[in-house]
UniProtKB/Swiss-Prot annotation:
SUPFAM superfamilies, per the entry: beta-lactamase/transpeptidase-like (SSF56601)
Protein source organism: Phocaeicola vulgatus
Gene Ontology biological process terms, A to Z: beta-lactam antibiotic catabolic process; response to antibiotic
Keyword Metal-binding applies: no
Record keywords, A-Z: Antibiotic resistance, Hydrolase, Signal
Protein name, entry field: Beta-lactamase
The EC number(s) this enzyme carries: 3.5.2.6
InterPro entries associated with the record: Beta-lactam/transpept-like (IPR012338), Beta-lactam_cat (IPR045155), Beta-lactam_class-A (IPR000871), Beta-lactam_class-A_AS (IPR023650)
The family this protein is said to belong to: Belongs to the class-A beta-lactamase family.
Length: 321
């Protein structure tokens, strides 16, 4: 009887050891596999960080993949938005027009002598008469596709002001992630004011992502903003650069370009985009460069490099899955 009991104990002990070895082996294989294939967010963070670390300035980046996975690099800092805030302006204006029942096709007569001939303004070059007659939709198209400063200043002055814009955007993204305090005209008069129109990379990415994935304002007006951003003509050497020759890629984006100070430092060089790939992956990419010790072309190369790496990694992920 005693011998049988000892035999059972030995058999049970051997069985437990075998189970332990099996579990340990499976766990080790799983850990090895995870180590060999780290999460996409980790790979993106590491790859972007390597590019950012070599920059003679500060770069902040945010990526939102499929409205879910989020990557942040240098997001604790805030960056001058420059003309990126024209997306914020468009949303606030359209929301105000929704509430008041005003059409974007409302005609506006603009006295040419009230416009700034020295600022960036394709609109001013397109119309030579003393009075320019355009719809609000036309003005928005000028600001979103060509970053027209006169059109932006006019809408801030006569339609929806800076404070109203700032307040509305605070209902869409965290208050701490951005601030809009000045117009293009005010920043032109005092370049330091550009730093008071700021955003975190994630704040800008969140707004662009919500614009393309959620209903924020009237459907027709929101569709107009989205489609117009797909026609953006500025900054094609930034996020769009490595994507222009890629079949089936759709990009909507808005750029922002800063001033160069007396020391040759570029205050800001930005781009925020929503990108759809042919493999059903969509992502928002926000890249903000500030206090860059180099020229605009060099700053664009950093933005384009980050865009190329993100695109490549997301395409590889798609192939593997």
């Amino acid at each position: 009887m005693e011998k049988n009991r000892k035999k059972q104990i030995v058999v049970l002990s051997i069985a437990l050891v075998c189970i332990f070895i099996l579990v340990f082996s499976l766990f080790h294989k799983s850990a090895t596999k995870d180590s060999a294939n780290p999460p996409l967010t980790n790979v993106l963070t590491d790859s972007i960080s390597q590019i950012v670390s070599a920059c003679p300035g500060e770069i902040g980046v945010a990526v939102i993949v499929n409205n879910r996975d989020t990557v942040k690099v240098n997001n604790k800092s805030v960056y001058p938005m420059m003309s990126v805030f024209k997306v914020h302006q468009a949303l606030a204006l359209c929301n105000d027009f929704d509430n008041k029942g005003i059409s974007l096709d409302t005609l506006v007569n603009i006295n040419r002598d009230k416009l700034d001939p020295k600022t960036w303004s394709p609109m001013l070059k397109d119309y030579s008469g003393p009075v320019i007659s355009l719809t609000v939709r036309d003005l928005l198209r000028y600001t979103l596709t060509q970053s027209d400063n006169n059109a932006s200043n006019l809408m801030f002055k006569d339609m929806v002001n800076v404070a109203q814009t700032d307040s509305f955007i605070a209902t869409l993204i965290p208050r701490s992630s951005f601030q809009i305090a000045y117009t293009e005209e005010e920043m032109s008069a005092d370049h330091n004011k550009a730093y008071s129109n700021y955003t975190s990379p994630l704040g800008a990415a969140m707004l662009m992502n919500r614009l393309f994935t959620e209903g924020l304002i009237d459907d027709e007006k929101q569709s107009f903003i989205k489609n117009t951003l797909k026609e953006c003509k500025t900054g094609v050497d930034r996020i769009a650069a490595p994507l222009l020759d890629k079949e089936g890629v759709v990009i909507a984006h808005k750029t922002g370009s800063g001033y160069v100070n007396e020391n040759g430092v570029l205050a800001a060089h930005n781009d925020v985009a929503y990108i759809c790939l042919p493999n059903n992956i969509s992502y928002t990419l926000a890249v903000f460069v500030k206090d860059f010790k180099g020229n605009k072309s060099q700053a664009s190369q950093y933005v384009a490099h980050i865009s190329a790496v993100v695109y490549s990694l997301l395409m590889q992920t798609s192939v593997k899955s």
